[in-house]
């Protein structure tokens, strides 16, 4: 069955692989995660010159910024200073990363398109790229979350794939943009399992991202990788409620374990996910652990219990307008589970929804952790020997 | 393959199972974990009167203590006050738990023998019990750690089994004695997979321990359960070194993931362990998470980096003379791996040994986290497009 290193391939031996052609990398997005990813792509484009063309185009939504006392265009400043002074200040990107204000140029020139935009923009951005994509191009989505609609749960890689008619994989892991940008070691997971007609080997995709400080494992399981980054936020909220109640470390470990198993169950029940992905890869267990130790969802959920303020208020106070992903995802998941009549099969996800949106008492999380019993317990039975 | 709840059985429906006979429970040990376990056994003996005889005998190593200004015997005080005033003060045990100063009486009267003594005493305690065991009796070892000798790695359940000629399972999980004693919710794992001639179903064994606040999953994989509790200490030290170096959350999550996979690999390579146990059950992932968040090994390893003091000094200062399990286990494991010529297959375990006993720099843990490369990286290749 599974074992250490048995699932997945790394980019470790990329230089012994002879590629069919040198590929161009384009990055769609330039927020703090987008810029950190573009920096990595730029480093690898230079490091693996027989695999990649050096120039990495990064689409930047053009803005006027104040730079050294002057009003300047963000792309111009980036291309001069090799620094995204607005969204990733203090981090130097290699000079082969070029900021491009027109996403259509990125679309036209890339064989590998890396998507790192906030999920609410992805459809509109793709609309502008339609018809411009190179033959044989593929996408990699670094967008965490899932798109839920009446038709069900869709991965953003699926959204991109449908819009642009290309194969799209996923990258997700225990990766905080600023830590990655500062080259603090972390791991990540790529899900990439293209149909036969796609001519780019998975090692080459891994080599776009793998750095000495950013260790990539590439697996076939696209759905597992995408769902890990979405669902872990729900579990991080459950652990946050436990933090708020000052429950012990063992109780929190139990919530994490049960949450991880619900993540795995969700991915294997509704998608064709490999059960090992969630429990063994960075996109599952490791991302969950990081998020449960003081990530955004965790902190908001803790404050929810401790302060009695509403989640909307805390979202404003603690996240500066960012969406509290875990709560929103618990709602999406809940509505989806209702349509499948499977609410009771995901008691922890359901509890997070009920605490966040209904008036379930966080203390009742304990009840959720009990195994289902068919009978109530026969407390105080025979007492003689 | 695996999925939520698919590995293992719980005691949830114990009251619908009709047992062949009522069994007697004996607890060998009465330290703080031993007493917490005896409390649980006592509660379950009363709750499931058709499964168990009410009286639970707990072997107490007799000592004179000072109690309410008088010199008294520890067993007498326990049987009067239903409290282990020396090792688990402030916690009331049910009155059907009886302290017994003679381990032979416990041996003679129990069908289920629960072992909770410090590992260094287990052989001598068993020696006193030889020849007194009831026909059909089984053991459950709650002793964390492994016994390493020239012949290899042995589980304490194997030691007990050989000494007493009984089948012996294992209980281990994310369980801190004081939290369990105070009935803070946690989960645990039992490994119990007896040969056919043993007539006690695994649900009945699970029911000895399962409480509303102590949730048991019973699996077949005895080795995985036993090894989880031993090997997680090694990984907790690695995370402690990272804490000492003030590495980020993602780096620590990567160390935990890699450590968990080494635990799984060790258990599946040298024992017949199910790979799911380590990554899905409380005895693996959950116990590891708790231990990495400020457990003893974690704190000592952090202090080792921050203070520059030796581990022996820190053992004295921080653990009051208790053995630093993680360091000792890393040494045992290292010596065992040398005999198998497999040191390089367990780079994280090996690094913990080398940092603890040789003079490896903790910072070089990063190197260990890199995937093995066959070639050095072709940094600075072609740069033109
Ligand atoms: O995605 C992240 C880590 O990988 C960020 O975590 P939070 O959203 O929990 O802050």
UniProtKB/Swiss-Prot annotation, chains A, B:
Key words, A-Z: Cytoplasm, NAD, Oxidoreductase, Phosphoprotein
Listed GO biological process terms: cellular response to osmotic stress; glycerol biosynthetic process; glycerol-3-phosphate catabolic process; glycerol-3-phosphate metabolic process
Name this protein carries in UniProt: Glycerol-3-phosphate dehydrogenase [NAD(+)] 1
Source species of the chain: Schizosaccharomyces pombe (strain 972 / ATCC 24843) (Fission yeast)
Pfam families hit by this protein: NAD_Gly3P_dh_C, NAD_Gly3P_dh_N
Catalytic activity of the protein: sn-glycerol 3-phosphate + NAD(+) = dihydroxyacetone phosphate + NADH + H(+)
Disulfide bonds: none
Organismal lineage: Eukaryota, Fungi, Dikarya, Ascomycota, Taphrinomycotina
Active site residues per record: 232 (proton acceptor)
Enzyme Commission no: 1.1.1.8
Gene name linked to the record: gpd1
Residue(s) carrying Phosphothreonine: 382
Major localisation: cytoplasm
NCBIfam families xrefs: glycerol3P_DH
Phosphoserine PTM sites in chain numbering: 376
């Amino acid at each position: 069955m599974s074992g250490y290193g048995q699932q997945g391939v790394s980019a470790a031996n990329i230089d012994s692989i002879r590629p069919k052609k040198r590929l161009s990398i384009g990055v769609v997005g330039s927020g703090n995660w987008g810029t950190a990813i573009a920096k990595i792509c730029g480093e690898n484009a230079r490091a693996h010159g027989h695999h990649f063309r050096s120039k990495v185009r990064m689409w930047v939504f053009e803005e006027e910024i104040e730079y050294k006392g002057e009003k300047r265009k963000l792309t111009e400043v980036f291309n001069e200073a090799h620094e995204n002074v607005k969204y990733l200040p203090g981090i130097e990107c290699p000079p082969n990363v070029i900021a491009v204000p027109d996403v259509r140029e990125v679309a036209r020139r890339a064989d590998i398109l890396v998507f790192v935009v906030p999920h609410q923009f992805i459809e509109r951005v793709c609309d502008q790229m339609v018809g411009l994509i190179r033959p044989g191009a593929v996408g990699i989505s670094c967008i965490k979350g899932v798109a839920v609609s009446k038709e069900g749960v869709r991965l953003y890689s699926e959204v991109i794939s449908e819009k642009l008619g290309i194969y799209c994989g996923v990258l997700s892991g225990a990766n905080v943009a600023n830590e990655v940008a500062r080259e603090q070691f972390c791991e990540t997971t790529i899900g990439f399992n293209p149909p036969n007609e796609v001519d780019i080997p998975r090692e080459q995709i891994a080599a776009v991202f793998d750095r000495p400080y950013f260790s990539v494992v590439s697996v076939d399981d696209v759905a597992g990788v995408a769902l890990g980054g979405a669902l872990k936020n729900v579990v991080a909220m459950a652990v946050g409620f436990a933090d708020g109640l000052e429950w012990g470390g063992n109780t929190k470990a139990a919530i994490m374990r049960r949450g991880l198993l619900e993540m795995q169950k969700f991915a294997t029940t509704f998608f064709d996910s490999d059960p090992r992905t969630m429990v063994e890869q960075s996109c599952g267990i490791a991302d969950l652990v990081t998020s449960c130790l003081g990530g955004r969802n965790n902190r908001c959920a803790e404050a929810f219990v401790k302060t009695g303020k509403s989640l909307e208020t805390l979202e404003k106070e603690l996240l500066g307008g960012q969406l509290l992903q875990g709560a929103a995802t618990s709602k999406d998941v809940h509505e989806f589970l209702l349509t499948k009549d499977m609410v009771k099969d995901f008691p922890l996800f359901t509890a997070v929804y009920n605490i966040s949106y209904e008036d379930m008492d966080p203390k009742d999380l304990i009840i959720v952790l009990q195994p289902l019993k068919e009978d109530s317990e026969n407390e105080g039975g025979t007492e003689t020997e």
